[in-house]
């Protein structure tokens, strides 16, 4: 006799999210764009590495722009109209990721730079000699 097998759904259904928070983490090696709802639960994320860029190409501004456009495309499908942007990190992709979000048509309530700044904390890494 055949057993009934439960279907396990891996993805949640489409949620309607009118307002959210877009976090851009721009490091020297990669740019990660995470979208959360107002309560802080992650809705979608994208990164330069997840968009197909590998190695040194992940740290380029174009890779950051592609990651931001990828995240925004999913958000517009879920009905997001307004967003707040939090930018963190000193990487080269922070400005181009923000530019891609501005072009998308989502209304930005505010853009905040939340990069942690040390008050003379740990010693930074040495300068590179190439």
UniProtKB/Swiss-Prot annotation:
Cystine pairings recorded for this chain: none
Keyword Ribonucleoprotein annotated: yes
Major subcellular site: plastid
Domain of life: Eukaryota
A GO molecular function held by the record: structural constituent of ribosome
Compartment(s) of residence: Plastid, Chloroplast
Record keywords: Chloroplast, Plastid, Ribonucleoprotein, Ribosomal protein, RNA-binding, rRNA-binding
Coiled coil location: none
Keyword RNA-binding: yes
Biological process annotations from GO: translation
Record-level GO cellular component terms: chloroplast; ribonucleoprotein complex; ribosome
Membership in a protein family: Belongs to the universal ribosomal protein uS11 family.
PANTHER family documented for this protein: 40S RIBOSOMAL PROTEIN S14/30S RIBOSOMAL PROTEIN S11 (PTHR11759)
HAMAP family membership: Ribosomal_uS11
Assembly: Part of the 30S ribosomal subunit.
The protein, known as: Small ribosomal subunit protein uS11c
